[in-house]
């Protein structure tokens, strides 16, 4: 019982730090911070089952976009979104709104990262500042945009595929679209 209480308290503290920590820049500086690494490990554990896209579907994630790429910068992969999580105006580090998969030559999908998404209007109605996760500020994607949705804040986290441009960078040069 004591161990469970300590684990829950540690998780709660880590999540609080994830949401309130000061902002870091892109790249390795953020990746080397012990607290950030501990949080990223928690995200990996929380999303490990979603390496099987059928498990992700059963959990409410549905394909939203085909493979998204940006010539010269890399790709994000195929996005699977959980509509309930996108609509709730809450950012929970252990419950990402989107999962990103890279299509493989054999037709399989490989989980490469997660994305946190909240619509700007919903967030701004409740908060005076844009969201910060893992000590990193989110990006505002204005409308109109290539996705055809209202303005939203987003933050990518490459927890399953190393990104030499930084773990929070939108584009990963190692991810490819067919």
Language model feature labels by segment:
Residues 24-178:
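Primary mode marks residue(s) on the alpha4-beta5-alpha5 output face of response regulator receiver
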Residues 1-9:
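Bacterial N-terminal signal peptides that target proteins for export
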Residues 9-20:
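Bacterial N-terminal signal peptides
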């Amino acid at each position: 019982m004591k161990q469970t209480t300590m684990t829950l308290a540690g998780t709660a503290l880590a999540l609080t730090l994830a949401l309130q920590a000061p902002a870091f820049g892109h790249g390795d500086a953020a990746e080397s911070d012990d607290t950030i690494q501990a949080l990223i490990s928690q995200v990996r554990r929380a999303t490990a089952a979603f390496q099987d896209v059928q498990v992700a579907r059963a959990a409410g994630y549905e394909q939203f976009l085909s493979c998204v790429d940006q010539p010269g910068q890399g790709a994000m992969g195929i996005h699977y979104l959980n509509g309930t999580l996108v609509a709730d105006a809450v950012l929970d580090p252990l419950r990402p709104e989107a999962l990103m998969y890279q299509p493989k030559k054999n037709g399989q999908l490989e989980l490469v990262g997660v994305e946190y998404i909240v619509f700007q209007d919903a967030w701004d109605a409740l908060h005076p500042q844009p969201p910060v996760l893992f000590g990193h500020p989110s990006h505002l994607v204005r409308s109109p945009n290539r996705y055809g949705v209202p303005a939203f804040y987003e933050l990518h986290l490459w927890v399953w595929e190393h990104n030499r441009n930084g773990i929070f960078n939108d584009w990963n040069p190692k991810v490819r679209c067919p």
